A protein has these predicted regions:
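Sec/Tat signal peptide C-region and signal peptidase I cleavage site
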Residues: 20-27
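Outer membrane beta-barrel
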Residues: 28-42, 53-177, 185-209
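Outer-envelope beta-barrel architecture signal
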Residues: 29-35, 71, 75-79, 113-117, ...
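Hydrophobic, lipid-facing positions within transmembrane beta-strands of outer-membrane proteins
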Residues: 61-65, 103-107, 154-158, 189-191, ...
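Outer-membrane beta-barrel "beta-signal"
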Residues: 328-330, 362-376
Length: 376
């Protein structure tokens, strides 16, 4: 639903009259209220040794609602803001640790010549530049280790997005620790560069989180996002009470549109350093294909492979994952989807664990979901 503040209050005519009377030009402004609701049912082959049927929130996409707005300041410049909250459709609770606007909350200026500068809690460049490949795959790399599914947001952040010049565009972002006792005590930064030409686009991105789960600075750039149980590698495999002292992510990926087909590929390199001085190195490879059979029916298939190495315990875990989906659009705003995700642990990995589910008791796990999504 799109509206303006003036229209909602029924004062557009009155304000226009006052503006004419005062012979003063007023800048145009608007606020959009938007949202997405998604849920369904699912079957999981093995969670702790048992089969399970579940009612699930966010089967097609994570639910959210929010406000975004602009004000025209003239000469190609405008003020912008976004406030966006996540929630669980099945129980009504707030997501992102109960934050009022945990998905996004920022304000800034956008200029046709100089780009956009925003401040607040924002996505990093991994999400912006290569996350769409993960989203299009209808799956998540194990433990969202490369943040392709944006479980980690960057707060206290200043973010600049360049205008597009000759097909190129870039982003630089810095998240302050806000700590009086340590500049690097839970600070973060990220960079991104993208190129688009006709039906082809390719992007690279880098993000680094320093001391992301700081016991002495819980209001830093990453804060308690890092405590999420969904992030399987935030703690050391040697000492499970030791969180990462640093996480570095390099990722590159993009798409090619070929008629009714969308082909995507992505590679990410993730390096953890833990407080106990151990290290984990993960590499993710993803291929995805989505095909519009008709304007209403989209079929998707994707394969992901993750390879890792723990230095101290000298283990090399691996995971293979296949994602299949049939998505049917009942209208421009409502769709239903049948999705299958299957994961196979290999190498030194002891169990499979699809994102959002409890771990399997063995090296295999499969989930089948049927859900719907409605946007407004």
């Amino acid at each position: 639903m799109k509206t303006t503040i003036l229209a909602r209050l029924g004062l557009a005519g009155a304000c226009a009259t006052m503006a004419l009377a005062a012979n003063t030009a007023h800048a145009q402004s608007n606020v959009t209220i938007y949202g997405l609701i998604s849920g369904g049912v699912g079957y999981v082959s093995n969670q702790g040794g048992s089969k399970n049927w579940q009612a699930l929130s966010g089967t097609n996409q994570n639910p959210r609602w929010g406000f975004k707005g602009t004000e025209d300041l003239g000469n190609g410049t405008k003020a912008v803001f976004t406030l966006e909250a996540g929630f669980n459709i099945m129980n009504g609770t707030g997501a992102q640790n109960g934050r009022a606007f945990g998905r996004q909350s920022f304000v800034g200026l956008s200029d046709n010549k100089w780009g956009t500068l925003t401040l607040g809690r924002q996505y990093d460049t991994i999400h912006d530049y290569v996350g769409p490949v993960i989203i299009s795959s209808n799956g998540v790399n194990i433990g969202d280790n490369d943040n392709g599914y944006n479980d980690i947001r960057m707060q206290n952040s200043v973010k600049w997005v360049s205008p597009t010049v000759g097909g190129f565009h870039g982003t630089a972002q810095y998240g302050f620790s806000n700590s009086a006792t340590g500049f690097r005590n839970n600070n973060a930064y990220s960079f991104g560069l993208g190129y688009k030409y006709a039906d082809f686009d390719w992007n690279v991105a880098y993000a680094q989180y320093n001391n992301p789960y700081s016991a002495t600075n819980t209001d830093g750039a990453i804060a308690n996002d890092y405590a999420s149980a969904l992030l399987l590698f935030s703690k050391s495999a040697v000492h499970p009470t030791s969180y990462a002292s640093q996480q570095r992510i390099f990722a590159t990926g993009g798409f090619y549109h070929w008629g009714p087909a969308l082909i995507g590929a992505m590679f990410s390199d993730v390096r953890y350093t833990y407080l106990d001085a151990s290290h984990l190195h993960l590499q993710n490879y993803n291929l995805t294909l989505n095909y519009n059979v008709t304007p209403a029916l989209v079929l998707g298939a994707a394969y992901g492979f993750t390879s890792g190495k723990y230095d101290v315990i000298n283990t090399r875990p691996q995971w293979h994952q296949v994602n299949l989906q049939a998505d049917y659009w009942l209208s421009k705003r409502t769709d239903v989807a049948l999705t299958l995700n299957a994961q196979q642990a290999a190498g030194d990995a002891q169990y499979a664990q699809l994102f959002g589910y409890a771990a399997s008791s063995n090296k295999r796990q499969m989930a089948v979901t049927l859900g719907m999504r409605h946007t407004f």
